[in-house]
Amino acid sequence: MSQENELGRLRRERGWSQQELAKRSGVSRAEVSAVENARLSPSIATALALARALGRTVEELFALAGGGGDAAWAFPPRTKSGRFWEARVGARRLLFPVEPTALGVVPHDGTFRSDFLEPKPANEYEDTLVIAGCDPAIGLLTSELRRVDGLRVIALTRSSRDALPLLERGLVHAAGVHWFSERGRDGNELVVSTTLGSGYRLLHLARWQEGVALAPSIRVRSTSALARSRIRWVGREEGSGARRCLDRLLGGPGRTSASKRFRHVASDHRGVAQAVAGGWADAGVAVRLAAEEAGLDFLSVQREDYDLCVPDALCSDRVVLALGRALRSGVVRKLYRDLPGYDTRRMGEEKVVD
């Protein structure tokens, strides 16, 4: 049985929550969760404390059976054959089906056909950082991580609500989040706290402008007039920060619900801009960078913090430490500062989620 299942099974047999086990063992709840999900290999002191609380020996509690070091799929491939990336996240070696990313074509680590895997001889899985998020400029950060630390980055395109569960399950090192709140900068901390709980921290990347990417042929020049007009909108998936912005923009009193105002749904900011530029829609919500890159007009609606959420259990991981250093470097700040709509004055700041 795997380390993950054995620890969790014994805890559940006693009817204990992770918080209860943490209290009885003197280990933090975040660390209990990380060890259960194999995101963290326990220290000798932690292993002894957990074993003592559960009335087991360390050997019984943490014995790994059946090749525990083997790589496993982070999530099932959608096709029977294709390419995969490999990365170590915490204590686990994970395989990721290759998918489109904001970084273009990232070299793969092997191919698969049904259940047969054919890895490449040279593999970068120990030197790979996995981020789930939607920053269209992530390539600026990844280029510095490659140059300074020799790290490869796998940037999975995910909305905030889709990225956070991947982080909770120990499938990525960091999750991008932008969650507007009427209270201002508390939005990201609030959504992480309510979705994941404590044991996480936010690394600030930038405060960006989000608004309406608009075809130049549309003469409306205010968001309130846009909301009343009968133009064609391109949507975003539920759970994304951009969709929440669109819902607020279109969902005023007496108006048709936002979901009934569009036929097409884009998967990211550039997808929205491309749909408008290609004539599939007249408008959609995206960050200013994506709109200007596509030659579109832009009406600003709000400013949002874009943060990278990382678990406390991985803060001493080599690739996560490199991520923090890169965000605090003047090189990355200067690159992002030159982008339209990005405010980098607080880049690299760290906030613990209570």
What are the language-model segments listed below?
Residues 2-3, 8-12, 16-20, 27-162, ...:
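N-terminal hydrophobic or amphipathic helices and topogenic motifs
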Residues 124-134, 224-244:
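Short loop->beta-strand "edge-of-pocket" segments that line small-molecule binding or catalytic clefts
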Residues 140-149, 224, 236-264:
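Ligand-binding cleft/hinge of the Venus flytrap
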Residues 152-159, 257-269:
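Short beta-strand-to-loop elements that line the ligand-binding cleft
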Residues 161-175, 179-180, 265-280:
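Short helices/loops that flank or line small-molecule/ion binding pockets
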Residues 176-193, 273-302:
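A ligand-binding cleft/hinge motif common to bilobed small-molecule-binding domains
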Residues 199-211, 296-325, 342-351:
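Periplasmic-binding protein-like
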Residues 205, 214-233:
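Flexible hinge/capping segments at coil-to-helix
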